[in-house]
Amino acid sequence: MNIHEYQAKEILRKYGVPTSTGLVVTQTEKINETIDKLNTEVYVVKAQIHAGGRGKAGGVKVVKSKEEAKKVAHDMFGINLVTHQTGPQGQKVNRLYIESGCDILKEYYFSIVFDRSASCITFIASTEGGVDIEEVAEKTPEKIIKFSVDPATGLQDFHMRGIAYELGFKDNQAKQMKEIVKSVYNAFIETDAAQIEINPLIVNSDGHLLALDAKITFDDNGLLRHPNITAMRDHDEEDPLETRAANAGLSYVKMDGNIGCMVNGAGLAMATMDIIKLYGASPANFLDVGGGADRERVKEALKIILSDKEVQGILVNIFGGIMRCDIIAEGIIAAAKDIGIKVPLVVRLAGTNVEKGEEILSNSGLEIIPAHDLADAANKIVEAIR
């Protein structure tokens, strides 16, 4: 789960991380009175969307008068902001964060992530802040600093000292950086975060370190322990089909292709998407119905897939272990009769009760294309939509 910048800063401040401060606006009629509450010479108006690249797209404006700030805020509120992360459709700006500006002497990058490949927590830092870290990693990888934390021992003093040293901090600033590392680590652990990113972390004209922008992504599996964080969820920033799927207990991610996929198991789902690409087409989604799906969940899964107007065909790939193939077959038939599947549908079943499932499908009277293995299924669905 993602949250907005102003929410991320609120959490970080609770853990002792110094951040820039401001006020959030969620209604256009509140813009003027909100800006009037700020006593500053420089105003920073920031669009609040769950995507990076806001500055380059015009979603962050720095102005030097109250009246100019009001005009910029009114112009920005409600627009469709298109960044390199939103795609061409953009994201509507329903919230603004208006901050007091500050003098910047130097910008840094600092983040903490769970590194799945190394099975540990990793700090990533760079003296090149305020730009895309991916660009820095590609062009000047030597400027990327990494420190891994063994989960068995946790954060140690040498991690904090090492990060401060590698970033070139000395004396009081080194002490500040060590405290920020400790605070960010504590926030990461205690909130079940998957990533905390501060970009940029700045040194201001007073020599103080400050988080000027912040992003936090949370592990969805840990949200049950954090109702206060769950309450920060902004459903307007999420794909409505993904929200609908989550409410139905389905794992769904919309993609840019035209072949809808319904699979049980994340690994099998990824293999299915890969083989669709191998045969010359693109998946429209990742959809894992899980191991305990019943007839109604299968029916809802197909409805969600067909709600995507880009879908020209559907590939169902089920390995019946915990899930029985006959249950899947009944769900497919129920969905087909209820909503009327008007695109090619290829079904590949294997495992528990596969013969019964195939019999149910063949006797349904519906135009369902059977497949014997994954390669056969991918070939048939790609040919069917051509």
UniProtKB/Swiss-Prot annotation:
Location of the ATP-grasp domain: 9-244
Pathway participation: Carbohydrate metabolism; tricarboxylic acid cycle; succinate from succinyl-CoA (ligase route): step 1/1
Any one cellular-component term (Gene Ontology): succinate-CoA ligase complex
Residues reported in the UniProt entry to bind substrate: 264, 321-323
Keywords: ATP-binding, Ligase, Magnesium, Metal-binding, Nucleotide-binding, Tricarboxylic acid cycle
InterPro entries: ATP-grasp, ATP-grasp_succ-CoA_synth-type, ATP_grasp_subdomain_1, Succ-CoA_synthase_bsu_CS, SUCC_ACL_C, Succ_CoA_ligase-like_bsu, Succinyl-CoA_synth-like
Keyword Flavoprotein attributed: no
Pfam family, one: Ligase_CoA
Positions with a binding annotation for ATP: 46, 53-55, 99, 102, 107
Annotated GO MF terms: ATP binding; magnesium ion binding; succinate-CoA ligase (ADP-forming) activity; succinate-CoA ligase (GDP-forming) activity
Catalytic activity as recorded in UniProt: succinate + ATP + CoA = succinyl-CoA + ADP + phosphate; GTP + succinate + CoA = succinyl-CoA + GDP + phosphate
Xref: SUPFAM superfamilies: Glutathione synthetase ATP-binding domain-like, Succinyl-CoA synthetase domains
EC top class, as a word: ligase
Cofactor notes: Binds 1 Mg(2+) ion per subunit.
Gene Ontology process terms (BP): succinyl-CoA metabolic process; tricarboxylic acid cycle
Binding-site positions, Mg(2+): 199, 213
Family: Belongs to the succinate/malate CoA ligase beta subunit family.
Name under which the protein is recorded: Succinate--CoA ligase [ADP-forming] subunit beta
Organism field: Rickettsia peacockii (strain Rustic)
Gene: sucC
